[in-house]
Structure formats: structure tokens, C-alpha cells
Amino acid sequence: MTNANSPRHWTVRHFSQANPFGPGCDNVPALLRRLADSIEALGPVEIQNVVIESEMTEHGPWQSGTVYFHLPDDAATD
């Protein structure tokens, strides 16, 4: 029996991508398309979270994103 006060643990996979540095690095729609293409390339996955961040540069905010996800077989190994 599991103690109700015990924290649950699991493994989550992730990848990060950014727009190319320079003019256009602040283009959020381009970043979202890039992330969506990468998610589709993974095949069937369960998305846990998507985080968008920005870092100020001389070209404006440099956008990046991190996708946290699970593969279908991950539940069997946790």
C-alpha cells in the first residue's frame, strides 16, 4: 500500500528549441511552428507541458521553448 503522503515520482522527457539568433529571433509564431513540427515528428506522445521563454538581446527578445512529454511506453517503465 502506498502512503498517501508519499510524493509521486515519474520520468518526463523534454527537448528545447529556439529561433535562430539574429533578426526574427522574437518571432513567436515561427517558434510555435518549429515546436509543433518537432512534436509531430515524435509520433504519438502525451504532452505534459510547453514553456516559452525569452532572453533579451540586441535583436529583441530571443524566444525559445521547452516541450515536456511522455512516450506511450514510458508508463510501463515508471
Located regions from the model:
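Short, charge-rich amphipathic interface segments used for partner binding and complex assembly
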Residues: R34-D78
